[in-house]
Amino acid sequence: MNTEILGVALQILLLLVISYPLGKHIAKVYKEGNDCMRFMAPIERFIYKLAGINPNEEMDWKAFLKSLLIINVFWFFWGMILLVSQGYLPLNPDGNSGQSPDLAFNTCISFMVNCNLQHYSGESGLTYFTQLFVIMLFQFITAATGMAAMAGIMKSMAAKTTKTIGNFWHYLVISCTRILFPMSLIVGFILIIQGTPMGFDSKMTIPTLEGAEQTVSQGPTAAIVPIKQLGTNGGGYFGVNSSHPLENPTYLTNIVECWSILIIPMALVFALGFYLKRKKLGYVIYGVMLFAYLLGVFCNVHYEMAGNPKIDEMGIDQSCGAMEGKETRLGPGATALWSVTTTVTSNGSLNRMHDSTMPLSGMVEMLNMQINTWFGGVGVGFMNYYAFLIIAVFISGLMVGRTPEFLGKKVEAREMKIATIVSLAHPFVILIFTAISSYVWVYAPEFVESEGGWLNNPGFHGFSEMLYEYTSSSANNGSGFEGLGDNTYFWNYTCGLALIISRYLPIVGQVAIAGLLANKKYTPESAGTLKTDTVTFGVMTFFVIVIVAALSFFPAQTLGPIAEYFSIY
C-alpha cells in the first residue's frame, strides 16, 4: 500500500517539476519562435510551400475559425472513405474488413474532434493502414487544432487592441513540429525499449501455459501510443487500451504514459502566464486546476484501495484493494491516479475497466468530464476555463460595484451571452441525450432488444453507463463504462451528434469572445480594477465553476453513482 501511494506521489511530482519549463518552451514557440526547436524551421517552410500557406498572414477571429472548421471537414471525408474501404487497402496482413457506415461515422467524428470514443476493438476494427493514416494522423491534427486555437486566444489576450489573432495554419504546423512530434519520439523510444511492439507483421501464434495456441495482435503500436497520450486523444491501439500488456507492458511505461496525458495541458497554463507576461495569473489558474485534480486523486485512491464492502462480507481478503477490473502489475493506486488524470483531460485512455470502479470513484470520473475545465484537452482545457473566467469576472465586478474588466478590456453583455451559452451547452447536451436514451430504454424495449439490449447492468449502474457515455462524448474524452453495448445505430449516431455539438460550439464561442475582447479599447489598470491574479479571485472562479457546472448534474448523479453507493454501503 505504501509503495503504491509513493508511486502516485512520484508521478504527480514529475508533472509539477516538468510542466513549468515545458510551459516556458511552449510560450516561446508561439510568441518568439526563438525556442530550442527552431531547427525545425526548414521542414515547416517546406510544409507551408507544399500547402500554399503564407504563415505571416494575420487572420481575424472569423477567418481563424473558418480555417479551423475547413480542415476538420476535409479530414472527416478523408477518414470516412478510408475506414469504409480499409479491407481493400494495403497494410492489412490480418485481413480485417471495412467498417460499416454508422460505425465509420462515429469513429471518424470521434477522432476528428479529439474524443477517440471507440465503438470497435482496435485489433479487429482497424488495419495498420487506417491506424496510421486515419487514427494517428487525426491524433496529431486534432491535438494541434486545440493548441492552435489556444495560441490564437493567447495572442488576442496579450494585445492591447487588435483585430487579428494570428495565423491558424502557422500555429497548427508549429504545434506538431516543435511540441507534439519531438515529445512523441521520446515517449515512443521508451515504449520500444520496454517491449511495446513496432512493426507490420501479422498476428503472432504463441503457446499458452495450458498448452493451447493463441493469436496475439501486434503492429506499429509504439508509433501510435505516444501521440495517443500526449495529444489527450486516448484511442487505444488495442481494444482494452493501456490495460493491454503490449500497449503498456511495465510499471515504467505506466508512469510515462500517465505523465504524458497531463504534461502538455499543465504546461499550457504556465505558457499562458509566460506569453502574457502575467506569471501570477498563470499560477492562480494552475492552482485552481491542481486543487481540483488532487481532490479527485485523493478520493479515487482512497476508495479503490479501501476495497469493496460486499466482498468484505464474503470473507475475502482485500489487502490489495478493490482489484476487480484492474491489472495486477499496476494495482489500484496507479490505476486510480490514471482514471482521474484521464478524465480531468479529454484523454479517455484506460489502464483498468472504469465500469468496475467503486461508485464514488465513478462519480469523480464523471464529474471531471462534466465540469470539463480542470486542465482539459491540449489547448481546449484552458479555453473551457476561459468561459467560466469571463463569467466570474462579470459576477465579481457586479458584486463589488466595479465595471467588469479582464486584462484591460470591458466584459459586456455580448461576451457574457456567449460565455453563458458555452457553459450551459455542455450539461444541456449530456442531460438531454441521457434523457432520450433512458426514455427509449423504458418505452421502446423492442427497439432496444433489436440492437442487442444495450445494458448488461440495469438499475443504478445501467443508468450510470448511459450517463457516462454521453458525458464522455460531450467532454471529448472517449472513455466508457463498457457494460454498455454501444456499437449500434442509436449509440453511433447520437454520440456522433453529441461529439460535433460539444466540440465546435465551445471553440467557436471561446474564440469569438477572444476576438471581440481583442477589438475593444484597452483600459490601463488602476486602483479600481478588479484583480484577476489573486487567490481570492481564484477561489471565486472555482466556486462559479462548481455552482454552474457541477450542480447541474447533481440530480443525475443521485440517480446513478450516489444511489449505487448507498446500495452497497
What name fits each language-model region?
Residues 68-82, 174-197, 261-264, 273, ...:
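Selective recognition of specific alpha-helical transmembrane segments in multi-pass small-molecule
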Residues 1-106, 161-166, 170, 174-207, ...:
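N-terminal alpha-helical transmembrane segments of multi-pass membrane transport
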Residues 126-200, 255-282:
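A conserved hydrophobic secondary-structure block that centers on an alpha-helix together
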